[in-house]
Amino acid sequence: MKIRFCGAARSVTGSCHMITFEGGSILVDCGMRQGEDAHTDYGEGDFPFIPSDIKALLITHAHIDHTGMVPLLVKRGFNGPIFSTEATAKLCGIMLPDSAHIQEQDAEYQNRKNERAGKPLVEPLYTAQDAENSLKLFKGVRYDSIIQICPGVEARFTDVGHLLGSAAIEVWVTEGGKKTRIVFSGDIGRDDRPIIKDPESPEGADYLVLESTYGDRLHTEAFELYQADRKSTV
């Protein structure tokens, strides 16, 4: 078994991790790189793998830096199941078509400039139809249920309180009679927030892939922030 980091390694956006095992490969997230991270081969749509070879895709949450390349993945040949929580699947039903609309608008704007300059026209990274095609592959799952992803691979989604539907994903890979447990944290939320539940911690792992966007600082307690806002308002 191997884990390959195809995105969000030494950068913040573009989460995409590949697990390769005896039976093939699966992905955890397929996000769009944004800002300075966008100017890379992956950010321009060149996957470091063959999309049609991927058995399944698991999504931690709906934010575009974790899902924004899913329509392109499908456009390039991926046709496997996409597993996410039910809430994430519904949010992607809004966000992926919206992202496709932006891609189409950007291409249209660029082509107006290219026509005036006598340059070749460009195509959008993906279209609204590509987004709709990808949404047909989503399979909503419940928190805390162990599901089979493909032969030799199981997974469980655990609430991490980042946004509605967000999850850490525990993946069990069985090969050669040995079961290995890998935990992908996704983006982790904070305790004591309204509406969103507090993060839950999976019980142990052989390997942990942990987000570290704010790993070098301590957050102010939510109640202290509320008190400060209340005082400044009054």
What are these regions (language model features)?
Residues V171, A205-R217:
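Gly-rich Lys/Arg/Thr-decorated short loops/hinges at beta-loop-alpha junctions or inter-strand turns
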Residues Y42, F223-D229:
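Charged helix-capping and loop-helix junction motifs
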Residues A9-S11, F21-G80, S84-F138, I188-P199:
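Pre-active-site segment of Zn-dependent metallo-hydrolases
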Residues K231-V234:
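Conserved small/polar residues in nucleotide/adenosyl-binding loops
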Residues I196-K197, H219-F223:
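Short, solvent-exposed loop/turn segments at secondary-structure boundaries
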Residues K2-C6, T20-F21, V141-E200:
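Catalytic core of the metallo-beta-lactamase
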Residues K2, C16-V28, D46, T180, ...:
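Catalytic cores of nucleotide-enabled group-transfer and carboxylate-activating enzymes in metabolic
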